[in-house]
């Protein structure tokens, strides 16, 4: 499975094409729209979310509510494009229209792709960079992830995400009875946090940052239950599933670090407190006493829950902008201000769920058969029985 996205933040639409989705997967627009709505929620979001009410159009690859094995094309329109038709339109501008158009962006924002991208592609107007590098693109990544989640759900695999930390405020209560309980609690939290008291403090931290013209980041965690043992590979570096998961999470806008399981904490513990003892019982087969490895060893799943964390830096667009340099005059100025969020960590947890779900679904489809959902399901059932008796 693979996908590609296209579209700019204030262009007419965002598009993604998904290839390799097996035939026979039940899929309707509401499945995807539910995930898009989750992405748009979250304390600290900016005014753009009041304009956009994201709804997907499935334009190929699905017939009568079932995937047919062909590429799936998904489109999400940008309602805000109505205000940007001249600035972001594809048609050439007249000389008069160029004069009337807003000035070019020549002051790169520290922390963004603006300057590096402008140098790479030779853009004197950095809007060409910031429009594509915007996190608005994650809209269709979440759409792709929604399809991957459907694949996983059909195979009995559950995905959930939550926020562990925002702006230095860390959740103390992170335990849960079932993944359904985790989902229920976090869906009711404006910051997608399991710890209610910490959630209130996180919201206050966001308010304080917004009032001062600043932004704050945080840490999100994705948990996946039900993965079979042995998905991934130890044979080649580029087939290791933990490497693919790390790359996927790091590809999310503003993410600067990834942990799997206890992650960096492993550096502070002796091996006896890091590695997970192996157990066996007749009902479950092989299992582990603990899950410090986060469900992955040697590039493969262990059968325990997959646990991935990502660190998101504060959004670089600030209402009290940092110093930068105008590329035309080379003079020092305050960086450009674009409409932005004060904190997008809660929304980023939904994006993290999407990219993790995509990588896991891809690994399952590759390993257990790529064409039909019923065949994949049967192959996994046989594999699980084999693993129990091994």
UniProtKB/Swiss-Prot annotation:
Catalyses which reaction? 5-O-(1-carboxyvinyl)-3-phosphoshikimate = chorismate + phosphate
* Record-linked InterPro entries: Chorismate_synth, Chorismate_synth_AroC_sf, Chorismate_synthase_CS
Annotated pathway: Metabolic intermediate biosynthesis; chorismate biosynthesis; chorismate from D-erythrose 4-phosphate and phosphoenolpyruvate: step 7/7
Q: Which cofactor does it need?
A: FMNH2
List the residue ranges forming a coiled coil, or say none.
none
Enzymatic class? lyase
Indicate yes or no for the key word RNA-binding.
Answer: no
Biological process according to GO: amino acid biosynthetic process; aromatic amino acid family biosynthetic process; chorismate biosynthetic process
> In the Enzyme Commission scheme, what number(s) does this protein have?
4.2.3.5
Q: List the disulfide bonds.
A: none
Superkingdom field:
Bacteria
Q: Membrane-spanning regions, if any?
A: none
Q: Which GO terms describe its cellular component?
A: cytosol
| Cofactor comment | Reduced FMN (FMNH(2)).
Which keywords accompany this UniProt record?
A: Amino-acid biosynthesis, Aromatic amino acid biosynthesis, FAD, Flavoprotein, FMN, Lyase, NADP
Assembly and oligomerization: Homotetramer.
Q: What does this protein do?
A: This reaction introduces a second double bond into the aromatic ring system.
Q: Which family does it belong to?
A: Belongs to the chorismate synthase family.
- What is the name attached to this protein's record? Chorismate synthase
The protein's organism comes out as Bacillus cytotoxicus (strain DSM 22905 / CIP 110041 / 391-98 / NVH 391-98)
């Amino acid at each position: 499975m693979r996908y590609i996205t296209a579209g700019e933040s204030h262009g007419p639409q965002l598009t993604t094409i998904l290839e390799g989705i097996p035939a026979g997967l039940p899929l309707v627009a509401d499945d995807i729209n539910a995930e898009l709505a989750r992405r748009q929620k979250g304390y600290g979001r900016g005014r753009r979310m009041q304009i956009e009410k994201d709804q997907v159009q499935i334009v190929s690859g699905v017939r009568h509510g079932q995937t047919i094995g062909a590429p799936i094309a998904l489109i999400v329109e940008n309602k805000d494009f109505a205000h940007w038709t001249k600035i972001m339109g594809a048609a050439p501008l007249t000389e008069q229209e160029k004069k009337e158009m807003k000035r070019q962006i020549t002051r790169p924002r520290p922390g963004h792709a603006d300057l590096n991208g402008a140098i790479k592609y030779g853009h004197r107007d950095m809007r060409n960079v910031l429009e594509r590098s915007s996190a608005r693109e994650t809209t269709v990544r979440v759409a792709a992830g929604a399809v991957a989640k459907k694949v996983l759900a059909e195979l009995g695999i559950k995905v959930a995400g939550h926020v562990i930390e925002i702006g230095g405020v860390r959740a103390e209560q992170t335990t849960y009875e079932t993944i359904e309980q985790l989902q229920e609690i976090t869906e009711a939290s404006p910051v997608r946090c399991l710890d209610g008291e910490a959630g209130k403090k996180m919201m206050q931290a966001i308010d304080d940052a917004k009032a001062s013209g600043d932004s704050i980041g945080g840490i999100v965690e994705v948990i996946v239950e039900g993965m079979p043992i042995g998905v991934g590979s130890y044979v080649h570096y580029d087939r290791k599933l933990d490497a693919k998961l790390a790359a996927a999470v790091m590809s999310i806008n503003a993410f600067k670090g990834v942990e799997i399981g206890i992650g960096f904490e492993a550096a502070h513990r002796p091996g006896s407190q890091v590695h997970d003892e192996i157990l066996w019982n007749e009902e479950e087969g092989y299992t582990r006493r603990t899950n410090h490895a986060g469900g992955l060893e040697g590039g493969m799943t262990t059968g325990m829950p997959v646990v991935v964390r990502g660190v998101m830096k504060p959004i670089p667009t600030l209402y009290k902008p940092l110093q930068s340099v105008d590329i035309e005059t080379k003079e020092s100025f305050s960086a450009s201000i674009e409409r932005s969020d004060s904190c997008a960590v809660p929304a980023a947890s939904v994006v993290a769920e999407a990219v993790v779900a995509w990588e896991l679904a891809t690994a399952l489809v590759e390993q257990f058969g790529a064409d039909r959902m019923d065949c994949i399901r049967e192959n996994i059932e046989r594999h699980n029985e084999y693993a129990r008796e091994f």
